Amino acid sequence: MVSSFRVQQAAREIRAGAVIAYPTEAVWGLGCDPWNEDAVYRLLALKSRPVDKGLILIADNIRQFDFLFEDFPEDWIDRMSSTWPGPNTWLVPHQDLLPEWVTGQHDTVALRVSDHPVVRELCALVGPLISTSCNPGGRPAAKTRLRVEQYFHGQLDLVLGGALGGRKNPSVIRDLATGEVVRPG
């Protein structure tokens, strides 16, 4: 179990522009402040990931995404709420309320409310975070802290300890407007 002190340290680092690694439900994640352009571009460079692909935002609770939901139909909110917290990611219209370094070339953004205790505690302190699998492009996602260190030795500002959540696969991704599964979990 990771200490609250360590999570608070990670929160301070993120606010200062850090890129960190942390355990999630299925694999290790890389994260940073979605509003910090330099941090997001650094994360993308570490992964060799093109900015136009877009990124996932994770949160502690659905209220952290309220700024995106002002004009959403109530059934959309209910649909997301019924699956969160948990391994469900929803593609939702971003209505140009997020920067392009988060959304990429898409009219939607991927959102998830995590049920991993470390992620939830961290997001409760800093708000929504960028979350992407911890791996360089083309390599398998890190499932151990050792693999995180092998992939990114000395390139991350902090590696937040803790155990993975026990899921075998990443979250399912669905389109909120259609309900269509874009990526099986």
Swiss-Prot record:
tRNA processing in keyword set: yes
Catalytic activity, as annotated: L-threonine + hydrogencarbonate + ATP = L-threonylcarbamoyladenylate + diphosphate + H2O
One record GO biological process: regulation of translational fidelity
EC number: 2.7.7.87
All residue ranges annotated as the YrdC-like domain in the record: 4-185
A cellular component term, taken from the record's GO annotations: cytoplasm
Group of enzyme by EC: transferase
Location in the cell: Cytoplasm
HAMAP family: TsaC
Family: Belongs to the SUA5 family. TsaC subfamily.
Name of the protein this chain belongs to: Threonylcarbamoyl-AMP synthase
Species whose genome carries this gene: Pseudomonas putida (strain ATCC 47054 / DSM 6125 / CFBP 8728 / NCIMB 11950 / KT2440)
Upper taxonomic lineage: Bacteria, Pseudomonadati, Pseudomonadota, Gammaproteobacteria, Pseudomonadales
Gene responsible for this protein: tsaC
